[in-house]
Amino acid sequence: MKALGARSAFYVGFLVGTCSLYLLLRQAGFTRDSGSREPGTHDKTLLEMLEEENKNWKKERSALFNLNHPHHTGEDGALADSLYKRVRILCWVMTGPDNLEKKARHVKATWSRHCNIVVFISSVDNPDFPTVGLNTKEGRDQLYWKTIRAFHYVMEKHSDEADWFLKADDDTYVIVDNLRWILARHSPEDPVYFGRRFKPYVKQGYMSGGAGYVLSKEALRRFVEGFRTKVCTHTTSVEDLAMGQCMEKIGVKAGDSRDTMQRETFHPFVPESHLTGTFPKTFWYWNYCYYPIVQGPQCCSDLAVSFHYVDASHMYLLEYYTYHLRAFGYKYRYQPPEPNVKAPEKVETRVLEQKDKVEAQEEENQSPELNDKL
């Protein structure tokens, strides 16, 4: 018994001593770390970052409305801010329940903050994220059906709140400010859409689904009307090709999204594939691109708009390269023409006039009820 008691006392003492040493070292380490940092330089907690991020969004009708155009304090973003107000872009992102944490949340935290409105389209509703559920199945064979339903949804819910309507996947990275520069030269009242232009099967070409594509307000209206009149139908699961065939039938032009030096802005692969990769001559890509393919540094515009197959970590890398990294002492080598923002400005005036007419009509419709009450 004495041996057992002595052994128990030893273990208890060892445990108490170990715990005391751990607490002492932990406190010493905390003090040392705290002392080595300047006041106010502590890293933000995850909770603080999330709270700061949420301040930029207003959640309404299962959509996220940006409350301001994000850019760095002290940075001259006057032109970007002006375009943000005049060239209003709704971005809807194709995702699914299994991809919200793996992919969609990284889109939400990076490039989508530069859209005016963001809608995440899924097969089921998720009010917390939020996503709009279209009661569709998941899978590649459902892509065009989800696309049809999504454009109908944004037409019904948000047609007066944006001028352009961008479709992107949850593994597509988009530089929305560069997209505004392209769109500012065009009126949203013109039937046109832009993206990475492919050429087979459609006379005027069609836009790559993975690189994303953007419809003008008039193109969106015609697309929805095309299904009502059965000019367009859901006959294939190949989303981008079917979209292009429908666009041609309803008189929506496939626009040229290249910059003034004829360099591509929408890209169906990650940057390194275009910059350093060599596509085999047997690769389908050579036969699909509407314009000649250029590999290497001239592959991509300095004002590139999108890249596809971008994983979560590369979302943040591209965000850093685009909005943070600068080489000291250099001016931009590419001086693009100033965007013409007059056309969207006129459209905004027409939209306001239309809203006034609608409000006046609503007042007339309500007046008999008011008279009855009086």
UniProtKB/Swiss-Prot annotation:
Q: Which residues bind a glycoprotein?
A: W284
Molecular function in Gene Ontology: glycoprotein-N-acetylgalactosamine 3-beta-galactosyltransferase activity; metal ion binding; nucleotide binding
Question: Which pathway does it operate in?
Answer: Protein modification; protein glycosylation
- The record lists its disulfide bonds as C91-C115, C232-C246, C299-C300
Q: Which Gene3D superfamilies match?
A: 3.90.550.50
Q: Annotated region Disordered: where?
A: 355-374
Q: Which InterPro entries match?
A: C1GALT1/C1GALT1_chp1, Fringe-like_glycosylTrfase
Ranges of the Lumenal topological domain: 26-374
Sorted alphabetically, the Gene Ontology BP terms of this entry are: angiogenesis; kidney development; protein glycosylation
Keywords per UniProt: Disulfide bond, Glycosyltransferase, Manganese, Membrane, Metal-binding, Nucleotide-binding, Signal-anchor, Transferase, Transmembrane, Transmembrane helix
Instruction: Enumerate the transmembrane spans.
Output: 9-25
| Topology term for the membrane | Single-pass type II membrane protein
Q: Where does Mn(2+) bind?
A: D169, D171, H308
Q: What top-level class of enzyme does the UniProt entry assign?
A: transferase
Its Gene Ontology cellular component terms are:
membrane
Query: What catalytic activity does the UniProt entry give for this protein?
Result: an N-acetyl-alpha-D-galactosaminyl derivative + UDP-alpha-D-galactose = a beta-D-galactosyl-(1->3)-N-acetyl-alpha-D-galactosaminyl derivative + UDP + H(+)
Q: Where does UDP bind?
A: M94, E138, G139, R140, K146, D169, H308, Y309
- Pfam families under this entry? Fringe
Q: Which domain of life is it from?
A: Eukaryota
The cofactors named for this UniProt entry are: Mn(2+)
State what this protein does: Glycosyltransferase that generates the core 1 O-glycan Gal-beta1-3GalNAc-alpha1-Ser/Thr (T antigen), which is a precursor for many extended O-glycans in glycoproteins.
Show the PANTHER family listed in the entry: BETA1,3-GALACTOSYLTRANSFERASE, GLYCOPROTEIN-N-ACETYLGALACTOSAMINE 3-BETA-GALACTOSYLTRANSFERASE 1-B
* Family of this protein: Belongs to the glycosyltransferase 31 family. Beta3-Gal-T subfamily.
Q: What is the name of the protein in this document?
A: Glycoprotein-N-acetylgalactosamine 3-beta-galactosyltransferase 1-B
